[in-house]
């Protein structure tokens, strides 16, 4: 995805497998415009993440960093049908009005990280809920599971950190096993959650990073590292990224979907 809401596909090698000196653009779709046409209203969030599912459909999510619910920005989750992508790659015309499908989010809800694909569908974590979505001549919401968040976290006057968290909600992309969806919430303390892939039911919940010294907060901003030994044991590693976020993310005039270090990251954190 690009910062102007397009998704591009580039050809990197020739038919013999040699790397091209200059990549060739073979697909360019304005996803935000296509999603607005499908939704019938304007989106006030920008394109954040894309991923292919197991059937070749291209899923997308709008959002950014620190999607504040009270600002009521309009966002969507959705996909472009595999058939349309194949048509474009074959040099044919594709009618996106019949190939782009969206799931309208409540104003103020949006994605803050990546999308995970499984054989069951696309798993997307917004600032308020975790979804399993499936392409079925439209977006089928198989399940939607809410989770806790205390909201955006920033350093206090006596804290031993600067900056804050990058997300308002859970902040991490979902990690998958064949049976589970795993991510952290943004409660206090932060908890690692495991959801049943089929039902979305929370089957395990455990506080993590809850033994830090006073003056340190927790914000998980990347996927949990997950290892499934296929014998009934799943192991995880969760990392604390608190302090990475720029204090400027709290500014209502900041467009948190703009991917730039100056807008997103705390410079003190980058230099340590």
Predicted regions and their residues:
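Extracytoplasmic/lumenal domain signature
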Residues: 6-46, 51-272
